[in-house]
């Protein structure tokens, strides 16, 4: 059964690739490029500290090509760009409470403090190209502009005949803000914000070679650090933000 399923999968990729019309190559040599949406190339080559960054317009990048090469100093990055709120970690308005981490492949981490804020729920699917969710804010007693939750990771899909990956493809969630570092008062105790969840990477590649040092990463962002204020009479123990869930 597994062999049959894998054969069907290979046929689906071949049918997809056979319908593509390759018009140009994308060769980056010590260069940086920002992309979003779907793009088709015959050859994609990233070398000598080259980077493709996925921008926040759609937070998604789909690459169709005959061959892909990424050297050990180069990569494709969709880190901390998504404002998706589908599985957002909950905000918390009490003084000292930490915001919860965004959910995706798993639950986001709960925010710390005397009362925990709940982590974002599991969402998305292994075969669905979705972006990660943002983390919740820490206590929002002052201004909503402070202590934001981390953004979620974006989404990257590569459909290719062959690929050699020595470098990195990542869609990591961003860290939640540390409260005091983002402009909080030094008097009161304040919680950190939740980390964003990791995003999604899909590689539909017939002949894939990955080497020592190569990396596929969809980790969630760390929760923000709380701040214990100077007011000795404040009975609150501040909590850190929850970590974001990993992605797929």
Each language-model region and where it sits:
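Sterically constrained small-residue positions within well-ordered secondary structures
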Residues: 14, 26, 37, 54, ...
């Amino acid at each position: 059964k597994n062999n049959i399923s894998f054969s069907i999968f290979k046929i689906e990729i071949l049918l997809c690739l056979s319908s593509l019309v390759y018009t140009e190559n994308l060769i980056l040599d010590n260069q940086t490029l920002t992309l979003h949406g779907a793009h088709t190339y015959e050859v994609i080559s990233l070398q000598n500290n080259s980077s493709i960054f996925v921008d926040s317009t759609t937070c998604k990048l789909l690459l169709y090509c005959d061959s892909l090469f990424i050297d050990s100093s180069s990569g494709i990055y969709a880190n901390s760009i998504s404002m998706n709120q589908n599985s957002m970690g909950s905000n918390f308005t009490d003084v000292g409470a930490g915001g919860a981490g965004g959910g995706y492949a798993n639950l986001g981490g709960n925010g710390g403090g005397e009362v925990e804020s709940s982590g974002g729920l599991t969402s998305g699917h292994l075969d669905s190209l979705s972006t990660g969710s943002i983390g919740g804010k820490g206590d929002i007693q002052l201004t909503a502009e402070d202590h934001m939750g981390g953004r979620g990771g974006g989404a990257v899909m590569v459909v290719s005949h062959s690929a050699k990956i020595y470098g990195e493809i990542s869609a990591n969630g961003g860290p939640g803000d540390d409260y005091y570092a983002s402009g909080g008062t030094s008097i009161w105790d304040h919680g950190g914000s939740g980390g964003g969840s990791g995003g999604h990477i899909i590689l539909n590649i017939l002949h894939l070679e990955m080497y020592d040092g190569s990396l596929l990463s969809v980790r969630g962002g760390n929760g923000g650090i709380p701040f214990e204020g100077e007011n000795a009479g404040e009975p609150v123990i501040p909590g850190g933000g929850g970590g974001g869930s990993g992605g797929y």
